[in-house]
């Protein structure tokens, strides 16, 4: 049986689709739902492309870095591989999700949030008698914009230095980079919890 993923045309321009990541672009061209009930169920579009080019990225039998560059199309997959492994390092053992209410993705350098700031009395859900007015909770936009700070790391390595390295070993370094980035994100989050985001919402200070 022929599958669509085997004939998909991979190009570098797939990374520059407006409002879409490379993985989302791949998924749109080769939806995972089409593989339900097949041996490929459970793989996403990127993982199917790894299978297409027979690139093994984990375990004792993992391939060398150079295998990504055996063709121009398989080379297109390398940045996504790096991105995924770095993200894995950011998320491993991270407590950031435990102190984050929600995640918002957007394009821009600053962000205006919304908030509800009820008093202690307004937080109480009191009994409402028949015909009486129901108490209201007000949601409003924050007065000040939250300015975002860009963080990043450029990975520089001569091809000769990494081409013969196994992908699972190369991934260790990438996960370390991700862990460092995750630590910085956590520090940023704790600072906002402590000092606020510029909207007069710093944490209360208690003296013991």
Where are the model-predicted features located?
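Hydrophobic transmembrane signal anchors and adjacent membrane-proximal interface regions, especially
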Residues: 8, 48, 55-57, 67, ...
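Alpha-helical scaffold segments that mediate packing/assembly in large oligomeric complexes
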Residues: 153-208
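Polar low-complexity intrinsically disordered regions enriched in Ser/Thr and small residues
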Residues: 22, 45, 111, 134, ...
């Amino acid at each position: 049986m022929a599958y669509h993923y085997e004939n998909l045309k991979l190009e570098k321009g797939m990374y520059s689709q407006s409002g879409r990541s490379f993985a989302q672009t791949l998924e749109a061209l080769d939806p995972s739902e089409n593989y339900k009930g097949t041996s490929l169920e459970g793989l996403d579009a990127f993982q199917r492309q790894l299978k297409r080019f027979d690139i093994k990225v984990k375990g004792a039998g993992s391939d060398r870095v150079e295998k990504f560059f055996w063709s121009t199309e398989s080379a297109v997959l390398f940045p996504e591989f790096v991105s995924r492994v770095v993200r894995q390092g950011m998320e491993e053992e991270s407590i950031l999700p435990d102190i984050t209410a929600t995640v918002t993705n957007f394009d821009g350098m600053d962000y205006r949030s919304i908030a509800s700031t009820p008093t202690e009395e307004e937080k109480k859900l009191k009994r409402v008698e028949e015909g009486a007015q129901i108490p209201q909770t007000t949601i409003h936009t924050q007065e000040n914009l939250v300015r975002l700070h860009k963080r990043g790391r450029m990975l520089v390595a001569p091809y000769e230095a990494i081409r013969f390295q196994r992908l699972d070993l190369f991934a260790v370094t990438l996960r370390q980079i991700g862990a460092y980035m995750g630590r910085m994100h956590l520090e940023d989050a704790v600072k906002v919890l402590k000092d606020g985001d510029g909207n007069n919402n710093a944490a209360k200070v208690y003296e013991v």
